[in-house]
Amino acid sequence: IHLIIMKSQSNFSLNWSGNTKATPRIIYPKNLEELKKIMAEKNFIIAGNQRSFGDNSINTNLIVSMKNFKQVLNFDKAKGIIEAQSGVLLKDVLGLIVETGWCVPVTPGSKYVSIGGMVANNVHGKNITNNQIKHHILELKILNENNEIVTCTPTQNKNYFESTIGGFGLTGCILSAKFRLKKINSILMNQEILEFTSYNSFFSILEKSNLYEYNVNWIESFDNGSIKGLCYFGKHENNNNSHTLQKFNFKEKEINFFNYFILKIFTQNYYLIKLTKFIFRKFKKIFYKKVSGFDEFFYPQDYFINWNKIYGKNGFFQAQFLVKENNFKDIMNKIAKFFKDEKNFSTFIIIKKFDEKGKYLNFYGQGFSISMDIPINSKFEKTKNFLNSIFQEYDIKVNFSKDSIANKD
């Protein structure tokens, strides 16, 4: 077994948001035999590509990485069904399937997640309906605590199946997943961006959702009972020209020192972040393209593959929670007042209409999901306590796959 023991003087960021650091022992099993030997250990977690925002990928003792389990086991191009080991990255799946006329039916905001991580977190995307990966999974193979390989489907070993999707590895180690793909004619996306300047206009614009496949909403400002931002809608281009089924040409870049320095200033300053959001909203509609590339639409944050570094050594935390529609305006106004009074801010606030049934640890319910990226600074503790008070007051469901601030209550 290949062991990496982190040096005690070096703190290692265990999640993408960089808000928790430790020096764990990390094991990279190369095959099933080595993995079974490790399963006899206690107090460890399974990790994929460690792109989680929250603390669900954190263990200060032992981490078992599935990065060596990176084979695509089967791809049926005719039926649009793929089976891949849990360590395979989504970007590698897309590189294989998109040029043949298929795409994943649900995708998070980054291609650099592992298949096992997508299942364990039951990822959701911009889809207006069937918004979670659970709707498209056909079969899972799990190595349980007894070192038995369990095959489960929606009808076979159903409890294992339902508990594993969104279960954060509590049922065992996900070995592979088989899921249904979505047929596409092009990697191009038809998109529409509409500006809203009030709650009424926001709700009115959302009525257009049935004309599209995807929607996400970006908040620029919310204050004194008002709200401003942009609604993004999209659907796959139906042009049947085969030349549009081409490989990705999206070139990722790393943030260099100069850009890092400038961006860090903007992500740490209350007034500059407000100015940036205002400028973005005003000019985005002018320069946006009616037809967008696949990567531009689904993975804009991957343009800078190390964008998380702009928050500095303390990192940030992402709060994502689900509020009922009748409480939405009240909660947004309370958050706005808190941010204004404390001169604190969220660099991004994303709102999405949400309607999912579920159970166990899954993120489900009906209403609006609110997602905020908040830099960790001197106001962190006060912000955390405020959000927890909101969670409790309104009995709000928190997305555990991204959470690192919710208290036990």
Where are these regions (language model features)?
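Short, Lys/Arg-enriched N-terminal segments with co-localized hydrophobic residues
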Residues: 1-5
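Glycine-rich N-terminal segment of FAD-binding domains in flavoprotein oxidoreductases
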Residues: 17-112, 121-127, 351, 403
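Solvent-exposed alpha-helices and their adjacent loops that cap or buttress functional pockets
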Residues: 19, 38, 56-57, 74-77, ...
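C-terminal structured subdomain/cap of oxidoreductase catalytic cores
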Residues: 45, 144-149, 153-168, 175-176, ...
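Structural signature of FAD isoalloxazine-binding scaffolds in flavoprotein oxidoreductases
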Residues: 54-73, 127-147, 173-180
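C-terminal substrate-binding/cap subdomain adjacent to the FAD-binding core in PCMH-type
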Residues: 138-330, 345
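Substrate-recognition/cap regions that form aromatic- and gly/pro-loop-enriched pockets
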Residues: 292-408
